Amino acid sequence: MSLHTSDLVLVPGQQLPPLETISGFQVRPGFFRFFGATVIPGGVNFTIQSHGATSCELLLFHKGEEEPFAVLPFPEHYKIGFVYSMIVFGFDIEEYEYAYRLDGPYDEKQGLRFDPAKILLDPYARSVTGQSHWGCVNHASHGYRARVTHNNFDWGDSRHAQIPMEDLIIYELHVRGFTQDSSSGVKCPGTFRGLEEKIPYLKELGINAVELMPIFEFDEMRNARLIDENQLIDYWGYNPVSFFSPNSSYASKKEENNEGTELKHLIRTLHANGID
């Protein structure tokens, strides 16, 4: 059997056997095409790309802890080109967070600023810790870290309406601003669920498509400042933290990764009502 899984196909329900142990975890080379963290039978596939890195480490943390409880260096044969990939078996999705450390050259003229001590957020993270409450500064000294999310949402037969461009009636909106005020009359103001509650209103207006202002994870407090005793924050969201992570402050429930589930539920319900 080839040591690499780059040429293998992930078959639903099929669990590949681990091949070795690193830092107490059973592992094997991963599926290099699956960037980010992907749940597979028996474990999680971690894949990250870096053009300049000479080494890569996967850091595992207990939820909320400052220091990693395990550091898993990627062996050289877990790398193809610029891509590192590893399957970690026995990964506890509910209790663990993860991040990376990358080493490499430091040459600002070439745009390279590798720091082997710097803890890095996965650029393909699908859920991020540290920003679940709107308008609150992330005081954690470790900054942002990633969570692994389940990929078992039931989309049913959800399909977008495929409305011709010339027939679209588009409503652009800010998820928080659309329902945050009490006049919206929703149970979950300022959230994906709050927007879902307003679908009948959108249909009354004749809307058949919605365009959402940034819904990825962003840090509204990054450039916060007081002007005339008014707190100004980055309300609109053009200050990204993680492009692939739904904004956790837009979740009505603050359980880990509920933002992803609520966003998917919103999309499914919009489609069911003929709205793209």
Stretch-by-stretch model annotation:
Residues H174-V210:
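A conserved hydrophobic secondary-structure block that centers on an alpha-helix together
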Residues L202-N230:
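Carboxylate/His-rich catalytic cores and anion/metal-binding grooves
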Residues G42-F46:
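Structural beta-strand segments of beta-rich domains
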Residues S184-C188, R222-A272:
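Aromatic- and acidic-residue-enriched carbohydrate-binding clefts of CAZyme catalytic domains
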Residues S2-P41, F69-A70, Y78-V83, G90-E172, ...:
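The feature marks proteins involved in alpha-glucan
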Residues L168, L205-V210, A272-D276:
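Loop/turn elements at helix/coil->beta-strand transitions in domains of secreted/extracellular proteins
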Residues Q49-S55:
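Short proline/glycine-enriched turn/loop motifs at strand-loop junctions of beta-rich domains
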Residues I48, Y100, L173, L202, ...:
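Conserved, mostly hydrophobic/aromatic
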